[in-house]
UniProtKB/Swiss-Prot annotation:
Signal peptide: none annotated. The keyword Ribonucleoprotein applies. GO terms for cellular component: cytosol; small ribosomal subunit. GO terms for molecular function: rRNA binding; structural constituent of ribosome; tRNA binding. GO terms for biological process: translation. Pfam families: Ribosomal_S13. SUPFAM superfamilies: S13-like H2TH domain. The keyword Secreted does not apply. HAMAP family: Ribosomal_uS13. This is Small ribosomal subunit protein uS13. Gene3D superfamilies: 1.10.8.50, 30s ribosomal protein s13, domain 2 (4.10.910.10).
Length: 118
């Protein structure tokens, strides 16, 4: 298994799909990385040479991925909560942030129903 950005990349998958195992890299960004590294998208990771894998590592290093990206997202949410913005309040209360209805639905965000105590 090749190791890129601290993640074990699956060997038996095509390069484009395998790179999406890294948090912060989707299919579009994965295609851009393959083009920049000069690697065909339909080649499996196990078929790549060590220098091609090194090129992929260099290209991935240009982006904010994995732990840094997770930290950045967490800090931006924390910043919204500290500022007291509407979005921050919604995050703090565990409610939908982007304007969805909450009278019905929103169960994923609100969690399971809590019985009314009498």
């Amino acid at each position: 298994m090749a190791r890129i950005a601290g993640i074990n990349i699956p060997d038996q998958k095509h390069t484009v799909i395998a790179l999406t195992a890294i948090y912060g890299i989707g299919k579009t960004r994965s295609q851009a990385i393959c083009v920049a590294a000069g690697i065909a998208e339909n080649v499996k990771i196990s078929e790549l040479s060590e220098e091609q894998i090194e090129k992929l590592r260099d290209e991935v290093a240009k982006y904010v991925v994995e732990g840094d990206l997770r930290r950045e997202v967490t800090l931006s949410i924390k910043r919204l909560m500290d500022l007291g913005t509407y979005r921050g309040l919604r995050h703090r209360r565990g409610l939908p942030v982007r304007g969805q209805r909450t009278k019905t639905n929103a169960r994923t965000r609100k969690g399971p129903r809590k019985p009314i105590k009498k």
